[in-house]
């Protein structure tokens, strides 16, 4: 149902309920407070287009039979002049549900709405003026992005688009963990390669990174290559194998650039890259620790500094500063979230792997301990589960380049049709292969709820049939483009006039089902924003594509017919469907091909 129709119906029902309730009680309408009117889609299509349970809500306080009360509301509603043209029929079902069937004209109105709003259809300004920071990916600059980072990128970027569709001012942020033990390991690994060592050689560091990318970094360092991340200063290889700090700076810059390239291939952009090292340089970590000590939220035991996280629901207190004077990994996270708060972001969402579950209570406890007014549930978290990559029925665990895991770039290239293991598949992939791969990976990785494990089947991603969900949706868009092009060629159909077409011939069951699905798009986006559920967009697109294919494959709904009225109405329906498919695909960062 279109938002305008929903608002009208909610208002009508509220007025009708007030009339019926006050008449039965003999009270004044001014004294009656109507409960919130909730409209839902019935689970069974045969039960109508809209269901409402207001009669059951009021039955007890009004001491009335819910079915009888529902019937009174139905009779009064249908008598309202404003209901004409909006509600075709209403009936009482079950214990007192009110089931409404919308008039055909109300359903057909979605076509005019889509033509009027075009790319803006489905969007609203409901949350205009609100600001949200979404942190996602946030990988250590110690290697290429893996498939888990890919799932974060798909989820975080789609969620950003969903919230922006409702008027939010969205700030996308990538937090670089460029301090700590892993960065030291990266430097030592690169130094070992620069000295000519390889994994397995005597003298190779025990905890070193073994991927081929380390050899590439060492080679470019020794050759004096200059590299820079998108927001960083250029760093030139110093060629000195003994200068570990120079190696560290070069390796971090090199991998930040590589991760930028991975994200570019994935079509993801960030508003800001925030460096963990900056927290130490600016004294934010020390300041946060000192504030917690001053607030009495810490204590010393066995040479370590502990945070009283049990005060805020954690199962045990946690070490903040170890006996060697270094901080545990959640301490800079607390300082980082203070920085988010101080920048004015009162709503923050972190998209992270489920392995971060244990840090949630610690970070929130630290923020509460500071006593600076940060709400208890700050920040929000979306935790995703692992991704397993399958090909030819077997799990793929190793990437030649990364050494121990499948990278995002691997997944994009393989899903686009590049051959795993081929040298050409690293740097010489054409744009069309990247587009196909990016579309498949992005759609697949948000096609399940974040808290479910996901099996990414490369073979399925390569299929050009209805089994492949992204192909199924994109083909619906391309198919409509083809039909409209044929209409132009055969009947000189002018797309610019479709907004004025009489769509009253669209009365069949298939047409009504497709119209209903189009009208659900705005509500679906609002629900996805409220529930932080970008997967809802993928679910919707599959359903919409299904309704279109069912309509188009029905021989009684042929579009290319001689009857101009029937043909133009159906072309208008297809054009509206094409627009909504394109809008939905754009929301999740997937292209809408004209040809396939």
Swiss-Prot record:
Pfam family, one: DALR_1
Subcellular location: Cytoplasm
Motif ('HIGH' region): 139-149
Class in the EC hierarchy, top level: ligase
GO CC terms of this entry: cytoplasm
Keywords, in A-Z order: Aminoacyl-tRNA synthetase, ATP-binding, Cytoplasm, Ligase, Nucleotide-binding, Protein biosynthesis
EC number: 6.1.1.19
Catalyses which reaction(s): tRNA(Arg) + L-arginine + ATP = L-arginyl-tRNA(Arg) + AMP + diphosphate
Transmembrane segment boundaries: none
Gene Ontology MF term list: arginine-tRNA ligase activity; ATP binding
Gene Ontology BP term (one): arginyl-tRNA aminoacylation
Cytoplasm is among the record's keywords: yes
Quaternary organization: Monomer.
UniProt record similarity statement: Belongs to the class-I aminoacyl-tRNA synthetase family.
UniProt name for this protein: Arginine--tRNA ligase
Organism: Paraburkholderia phytofirmans (strain DSM 17436 / LMG 22146 / PsJN) (Burkholderia phytofirmans)
Gene symbol of the encoding locus: argS
């Amino acid at each position: 149902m279109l938002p305008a129709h929903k608002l009208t119906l909610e208002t009508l029902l509220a007025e009708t309920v007030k009339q019926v309730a006050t008449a039965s009680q003999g009270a004044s309408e001014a004294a009656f407070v109507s409960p919130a009117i909730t409209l839902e889609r019935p689970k069974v299509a045969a039960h109508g287009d809209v269901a409402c349970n207001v009669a059951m809500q009021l039955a007890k306080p009004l001491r009335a039979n819910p079915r009888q009360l529902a019937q009174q509301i139905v009779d009064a509603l249908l008598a309202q002049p404003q209901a004409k043209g909006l509600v075709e029929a209403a009936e009482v079902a079950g214990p007192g549900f009110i089931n409404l069937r919308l008039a055909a004209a109300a359903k057909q109105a979605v076509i005019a709405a889509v033509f009027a709003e075009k790319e803006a259809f489905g969007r609203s300004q409901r949350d205009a003026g609100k600001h949200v920071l979404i942190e996602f990916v946030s990988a250590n600059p110690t290697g290429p992005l893996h498939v888990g980072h890919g799932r974060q990128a798909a989820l975080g970027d789609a969620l950003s688009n969903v919230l922006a569709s409702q008027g939010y001012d969205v700030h996308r942020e990538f937090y670089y963990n460029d301090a700590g033990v892993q960065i030291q390991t990266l430097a030592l690994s690169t130094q070992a390669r620069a000295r000519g060592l390889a994994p397995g050689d005597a003298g190779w560091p025990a905890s070193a990174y073994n991927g081929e990318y380390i050899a590439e970094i060492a080679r470019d360092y020794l050759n004096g290559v200059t590299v820079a991340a998108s927001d960083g200063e250029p760093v030139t290889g110093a060629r000195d194998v003994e200068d570990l700090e120079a190696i560290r700076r070069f390796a971090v810059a090199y991998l930040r650039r590589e991760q930028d390239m991975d994200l570019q291939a994935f079509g993801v952009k960030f508003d800001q890259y925030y460096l963990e090292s900056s927290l130490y340089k600016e004294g934010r970590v020390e300041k946060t620790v000192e504030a917690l000590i001053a607030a009495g939220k810490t204590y010393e035991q066995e040479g370590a500094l502990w945070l009283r996280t049990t005060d805020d629901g954690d199962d045990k207190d946690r070490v903040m500063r170890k006996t060697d004077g270094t901080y545990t990994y959640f301490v800079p996270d607390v300082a980082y979230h203070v920085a988010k708060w101080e920048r004015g972001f009162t709503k923050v969402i972190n998209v992270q792997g489920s392995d971060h579950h244990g840090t949630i209570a610690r970070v929130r406890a630290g923020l509460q301990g500071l006593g600076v007014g940060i709400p208890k549930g700050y920040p929000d978290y979306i935790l995703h589960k692992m991704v397993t990559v399958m090909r030819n029925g077997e799990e793929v665990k190793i990437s030649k380049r990364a050494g121990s895991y499948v990278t995002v770039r691997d997944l994009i290239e393989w899903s686009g049709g590049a051959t795993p293991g081929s040298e050409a598949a690293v740097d010489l992939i054409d744009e069309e292969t990247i587009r196909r791969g990016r579309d498949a990976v992005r759609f697949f990785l948000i096609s399940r709820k974040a808290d479910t494990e996901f099996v990414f089947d490369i073979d399925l991603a390569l299929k050009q049939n209805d089994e492949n969900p992204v192909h199924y949706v994109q083909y619906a868009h391309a198919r409509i483009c083809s039909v409209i092009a044929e209409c132009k060629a055969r009947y000189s159909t002018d797309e610019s006039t479709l907004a004025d077409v009489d769509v009253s011939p669209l009365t069949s069951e298939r047409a009504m089902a497709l119209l209903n699905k189009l009208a659900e798009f705005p509500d679906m986006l609002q629900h996805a924003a409220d529930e932080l559920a970008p997967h809802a967009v993928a679910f919707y697109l599959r359903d919409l594509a299904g309704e279109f294919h069912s309509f188009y494959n029905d021989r009684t709904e042929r579009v290319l017919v001689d009857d101009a009225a029937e043909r133009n109405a159906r072309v208008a329906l297809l054009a509206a469907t094409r627009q909504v498919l394109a809008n939905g695909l754009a929301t999740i960062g997937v292209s809408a091909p004209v040809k396939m």
